[in-house]
């Protein structure tokens, strides 16, 4: 209930149903205006804004209203009335009514905030916003996002509860296990020289819960990774962690697809059709990404076979390299791109390791069947290195038409995929080529392993992912092994990923062997899991959604920092609390830790 000693209703919830009633509201002064001897106060709370009118007929209230300033906390008692015709505000829930003040009480005064809270267009540095995050979160946009997140999380819980899942907490203090990023370590006071690790995910514990017989588990879990930050990464983040037993890949995907459909319908009244499916190989071939944005109708076309014999080493080299790739990206209407725009895209792909960006402008493709007019039909510095047959085949394969442009990537396949995949996304957004607002997708059949630069195998997901095929097939051809893994992609962002897990000791040992993990190392790091696999582990699998990332997409924020109450900066620091910080010598001594003077000196120097 809203009613309390202080208020009868939230400011943003006062509606026409309360007209002629006397009510009390509390909140912050969002804006104060003085018009012709009448004072208007915009009162703000988490539910929205209410316009309050204070006139001289109530002299005591008027005097207080004259003295209040933005961000004062006040209580107002008054009569709800209809706004005068022409003064309504359709953008506010309370936009057809106002509160005529009778009594005003100042509950707390406020200094002038370090940045305006009533101007969403104000440009304020993120560091300043995070330093005063408790003020930043008063802004209506931030209030709306935090409320949205809370309600979306509640919708997730309801769906999983209704589908028989149990909310089980797993430990925060655990042991270090390699999962692809650095662990945050916590020294043990009772066992000097030993350390806990904060979990990068509840992966092993949720698998143990399956062994324990809790066949449907979920948790809104805090996870920690000490890694370099990007727009969609934080050192501590929240994931919706899910695990099931006795369900196959398709059944797990259907449950989780249903979850996302439920959340979008509940929160945004958006209804999705069945999510399309695409294999990893198809995604990399057509989109050069394992998380393609299907809102953008552009595809890469492999043209290496056409370039093997051209007199252009930039193309011929990768075309004849088993690890190379030559791919074309046709942009309909792209011939209108200026030299300046093309130069900007060339600079963009260099970020991803590309050494240039070749292109052909198709000014006129009308007579392509009669040969290529290199004078007026095509425009590019590279066409002089190609025969007419190659150019005709190139135009036909890409489907290029008049006024198109074709961009090329030619290098190691990994470089082409990174550079041209990113270029596809950027051009699609720059030229407003998106065909829909939301494009969900499942990507399946990932490789089990990927090769490192030094020739070793590493898990593409994690070492507990179940491969397709038998133990013998895995041992014989690890390079071609596929995993029973699946990622959920939304608008080019991976929002969730999961797999079936290994539930036999024989297969888990074979995977460890492929990864170069010997018996002793496996026992030291994962002995408790290997023991559990000896006692009847059921077939199981699951998935985890990045809650921060999902909410970021749903509310249209540019960073997950905008949907987390108290996030860290890009350098994993908290401007509000000044964390991380030094601790006193007594605390360090109790933990058996001594900070080297050189480290302290380096830290002091870098802070100057």
Swiss-Prot record:
UniProt-annotated location(s): Cytoplasm
Highest rank taxon of the organism: Bacteria
GO annotation, biological process: aspartyl-tRNA aminoacylation
Chain residues that bind ATP: 225-227, 234, 494, 546-549
Major enzyme class: ligase
Primary localization: cytoplasm
Region (Aspartate): 203-206
Catalyzed reactions: tRNA(Asx) + L-aspartate + ATP = L-aspartyl-tRNA(Asx) + AMP + diphosphate
InterPro entries: Aa-tRNA-synt_II, aa-tRNA-synth_II, aa-tRNA-synth_II/BPL/LPL, Asp-tRNA-ligase_1, Asp-tRNA-ligase_1_N, Asp/Asn-tRNA-synth_IIb, AspRS_core, GAD-like_sf
SUPFAM superfamilies per the UniProt record, alphabetical: Class II aaRS and biotin synthetases (SSF55681), GAD domain-like (SSF55261), Nucleic acid-binding proteins (SSF50249)
Swiss-Prot/TrEMBL keywords: Aminoacyl-tRNA synthetase, ATP-binding, Cytoplasm, Ligase, Nucleotide-binding, Protein biosynthesis
One Gene Ontology cellular component: cytoplasm
EC number: 6.1.1.23
Example GO molecular function: aspartate-tRNA(Asn) ligase activity
Site (Important for tRNA non-discrimination) residue list: 35, 86
Residues that, per the record, bind L-aspartate: 179, 225, 461, 501
Annotated Pfam families: GAD (PF02938), tRNA-synt_2 (PF00152), tRNA_anti-codon (PF01336)
Subunit structure: Homodimer.
Function: Aspartyl-tRNA synthetase with relaxed tRNA specificity since it is able to aspartylate not only its cognate tRNA(Asp) but also tRNA(Asn). Reaction proceeds in two steps: L-aspartate is first activated by ATP to form Asp-AMP and then transferred to the acceptor end of tRNA(Asp/Asn).
UniProt xrefs under PANTHER family: ASPARTATE--TRNA LIGASE, MITOCHONDRIAL (PTHR22594:SF5), ASPARTYL/LYSYL-TRNA SYNTHETASE (PTHR22594)
Entry's family note: Belongs to the class-II aminoacyl-tRNA synthetase family. Type 1 subfamily.
Protein name per Swiss-Prot or TrEMBL: Aspartate--tRNA(Asp/Asn) ligase
Name of encoding gene: aspS
